[in-house]
Amino acid sequence: VTGVQTCALPICEDLWNAYELSWLNPKGKPMVAVGCFRVPVDSPNLIESKSFKLYLNSFNHTRFESLEAVSATMARDLSATAGRPVGVALQALSSSPTASIGSPDGILIDDLDIECDRYQPAPELLTTRPGDIVEETLYSHLLKSNCLVTGQPDWAMVVIRYRGRPIDRAALLRYIVSFRNHNEFHEQCVERIFCDLQAHCQPQALAVHARYTRRGGLDINPFRSTGDYPTPDNTREIRQ
């Protein structure tokens, strides 16, 4: 776990999807499932992805009476580690679970013809344009940062929903690109984006959601909001 300071936000969570879950039934037969874990943002600790993967792997040769027993064990352990109740939902592959892939209902800004030369977070790039109050959703596939522990690249789609003065889209895209050489955890990057937008664009309402590509059978999808927008559903981004 890693201690983290969080913004005081009404609605936020980190949603993890796990695609490589397995354990043994009482007869020693392997069982497999997919899982969804919801970690509240007010937890005093965040769960580091590599250690989470090692924890999940520890189930591979452990016998359990049922999927419910596995779920209860994970919920107990993860809640104790995070310091707040962690939601756990497992689906056995034998139950034929389904998952949807889609794009946000919003405006993709990646095709803007911009010049980029900043590759560390540059919040001073953010600005608004003159105009009436708008409510819109902007998104980009160009968010890339690096894992704070391993230095490996983290790739994500980031979705920004807000109400307020129009955010300059070219400036926003340059800002997103500026994370390219930045070393920080997924959750911290999303919180940084949220706080920078709050400070420099001062929207009346704001939500920032990122869906990161999976590594080691896990993907992380942080969500930060002022409370004016609901938690998004678990629709996968195409690279997930």
Predicted regions and their residues:
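Short, small-residue-biased leader/transition segments that mark boundaries at the very start
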Residues: T2-L9
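Histidine-centered catalytic/metal-coordination loop motif
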Residues: E13-D77, L143-H200, T213, S225-D228
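Secondary-structure boundary elements
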Residues: A75-G87, R129, C195-Q204
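Charged mid-protein connector segments
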Residues: A80-V134
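A short glycine-rich, hydrophobically flanked beta-strand micro-motif that places a catalytic Asp/Glu
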Residues: V86-A92, A205-T213
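Short terminal or interdomain "cap/linker" segment that borders an active site or interface and mediates
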Residues: G102-I107, L125, R214-Q240
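Short amphipathic
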Residues: E136-S140
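Structured core elements
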Residues: V159-R161, A207, D219-N221
